[in-house]
């Protein structure tokens, strides 16, 4: 078996970065962006393993924790954008070059930067380049598909800090500063998995809401999202 490669943690503090397994990341992306996204594809976009050596990664490598690959929240946001672009036929080569130019302009995780949302695809390209021509053809797609996704992302210091997978008007959020980025109720921080489990035990939505101090709407949003994640898994 090939040796796993990634960024080993050592004494690195994980507070506030969010942590998602490859399968969890794929489920989030399949639910919101591209149903065909696979675990292997995410790893291919993130880094090159021995058996995938012919593929040059797009984003930085995942963390390696006790033999398991974990993506940070910023990486999850980047992977979501990559998946959306690939779903519309933008080549990996064009996305990779756009990411490289974005990193030069914005620093690490350019696809998770607020500038990407405001400036669009063109900010990462050089006039006349191969990828500029290709990505310009996708500008309408960017406005119709990518913008709605990024509109549900909140930023702190220009970096993605919170994502509302059901939309900003709904109560479910992914926030790396809360519960390591697991989906939670926006107002209380109660994990959606907890609300879902209690509902599945036979309790009414009203009883669950009263027990955890959340609204009935929050309980129903949690059930909807957790059900969707399980279908996407």
PLM regions with names:
Residues 35-63:
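Major-groove DNA-recognition helix of helix-turn-helix-type DNA-binding domains
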Residues 68-99:
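A short, Lys/Arg-enriched interface patch at domain edges and termini
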Residues 90-153:
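Charged mid-protein connector segments
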Residues 51-53, 142-180:
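Basic, low-complexity segments
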């Amino acid at each position: 078996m090939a040796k796993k490669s990634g960024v080993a943690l050592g004494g690195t503090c994980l507070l506030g970065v969010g942590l998602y397994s490859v399968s969890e990341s794929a489920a989030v992306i399949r639910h919101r962006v591209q149903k065909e996204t696979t675990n292997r594809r995410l790893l291919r976009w993130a880094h090159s393993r021995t058996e995938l050596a012919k593929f040059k990664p797009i984003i930085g490598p995942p963390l390696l924790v006790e033999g398991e690959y974990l993506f940070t929240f910023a990486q999850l946001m980047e992977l979501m954008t990559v998946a959306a672009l690939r779903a519309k036929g933008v080549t990996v080569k064009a996305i990779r070059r756009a990411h490289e130019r974005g990193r030069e302009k914005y620093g690490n995780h350019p696809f998770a930067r607020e500038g990407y949302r405001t400036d669009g695809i063109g900010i990462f390209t050089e006039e006349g380049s191969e990828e500029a021509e290709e990505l310009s053809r996708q500008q309408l797609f960017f406005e119709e598909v990518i913008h709605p996704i990024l509109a549900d992302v909140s930023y702190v210091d220009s970096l993605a800090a919170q994502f509302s997978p059901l939309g900003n008007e709904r109560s479910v959020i992914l926030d790396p500063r809360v519960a390591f980025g697991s989906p939670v109720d926006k107002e209380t921080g109660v994990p959606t998995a907890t609300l879902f489990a209690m509902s599945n035990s036979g309790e009414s939505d009203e009883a669950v809401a009263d027990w955890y101090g959340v609204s009935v709407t929050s309980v129903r949003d949690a059930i909807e999202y957790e059900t969707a994640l399980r279908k996407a898994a």
